Amino acid sequence: VDITDLLEKNESYFGLGRFEMDLGIGTYVPESSFLKEVCPAAKSLTIRFVRTCMSVSPFPDPSVKSEPTRWEYGVSLCLLDKIPMEGRMIDGRVGYFTNKVRNYDNAVYDKGECEFISRWKLVPHREQLEAYLGGDLVEPIKPIVFYIDKQIPTWLYPYVKRAVEAWQPAFERAGFKNAILARPEPTYAEDSVFSVDNARYAYISYKTSPLKNAYGPSSVDPRSGEILCSHIGIFNSISDL
């Protein structure tokens, strides 16, 4: 299947169209835009683009000339497991992040919609299942691992790592030890397929910016609510709040 036209257009799946207002950009300039590289990995594909768009002022002024702006970014495509994790429906009595999807099997969902709790998939090793069910702490097959931006100041790294792993006691109450870990961003020699753009990796990025903010969205499997990855952004001025 030839998808060249789909990749070259500045549409919602691979383009910047839905971010125009946030980025302050307007008209797409295709002749100055290109697909930079395609990076395949196990069950995933990362595509990097360079797009050129004209700038747009939030307060239009005819005397101000629109200038071209160039943006480089990545898009990650991942192959989901054939059999999804068993989803857990929302319970309005407890606050959770959720993901609502329309389900067309009305024999199961009368309202045509289902809303799953967003949660990580933690599963004990088969040989430890009996111990897990007996109340012993066991390590999950696939722990939650957050990689920390190599650009983060050296003095700040141990505090970010400690903040991530401070959640371990909560997972221990669910029967898992060492369920959530923080590690430094690997070098190419350590992991040749690692990419910040790859949705298979949870990542904490460091932003050198006067903006006093932080964010932490996650990508989930719509079939079950399984959290596939999370990308946390920390701005260096957040300490000024």
Question: Which residues does each PLM region occupy?
Answer:
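Auxiliary tRNA-acceptor-end handling modules of aminoacyl-tRNA synthetases
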Residues: 1-152, 170-174, 185-241
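Zn2+-dependent metallopeptidase catalytic core
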Residues: 151-179
